[in-house]
Amino acid sequence: MMLPEACVATILSFTTPADTISSAAVSSVFRVAGDSDFVWEKFLPTDYCHVISRSTDPHRIFSSKKELYRCLCESILIDNGRKIFKIEKLSGKISYILSSRDLSITWSDQRHYWSWSPRSDSRFSEGVQLIMTDWLEIIGKIQTGALSPNTNYGAYLIMKVTSRAYGLDLVPAETSIKVGNGEKKIKSTYLSCLDNKKQQMERVFYGQREQRMATHEVVRSHRREPEVRDDGWMEIELGEFETGSGEGDDDKEVVMSLTEVKGYQLKGGIAIDGIEVRPKPLKVRAGTN
């Protein structure tokens, strides 16, 4: 005996988007129930109406909640095109990308240090490229209340190294994450991948500075470097953090940063697209299948 469609819809609303999508193969009742607005509204962020109102096309009409869900999976521009909002297809977890204009970048308003211009490879209307500086400081902020509750998040600086880059692989930068009044978590990373030939040339010019920074020497096997993304950009993990239950006064400010201010090392030739904050994959415990 088949359950009524309304009962099936109620059951599906307590599962996940992935379960609902796969259940469509069970029967026509599951397929119809799984397409209902009742089910998909449960999977949408609780503040989805507010998110849509902040989009660059706030008056767009969606034929169903499932269509809206799919749209958010593809991502939308919000806050005058300065942020990207997205949800994961199988889990409904929230992600954000803060554009370079939404970040605090020291001296980014000085044209002899940084250059702002439209980029065909950017998600946003413009990006910024470092011309030259010895004081690199990039800071982004987001509230935990804007993210999915009880979720482990990672923050990633989206960047590219240009063909004329210099001074990026001699002195490590610091990455950090700080949530509310909690302890700041600091790690070190290089801004470009190791290039032995280029390093030998730069040592001629920056040898003394390199000696002053000898205490920051990183064993090659443990050297953190940018990693290639599927979209052609590269990313540096700034750190990770957990969101709380989202109830009461659980909303906290997350400060994410990348800095290189200790080596007085001239550097240039990196393009910044923004900082992505996205859920990290669940870790599989040793010994589990």
From Swiss-Prot:
> Which organism was this protein described from?
Arabidopsis thaliana (Mouse-ear cress)
Instruction: Please report a single Pfam family linked to this protein.
Output: PP2
Q: Show the InterPro entries listed in the entry.
A: F-box-like_dom_sf, PP2-like
Single GO term (MF)? carbohydrate binding
Q: F-box domain: from which residue to which, for each copy?
A: 1-43
Superkingdom to which the source organism belongs: Eukaryota
Q: What is this protein called?
A: F-box protein PP2-B15
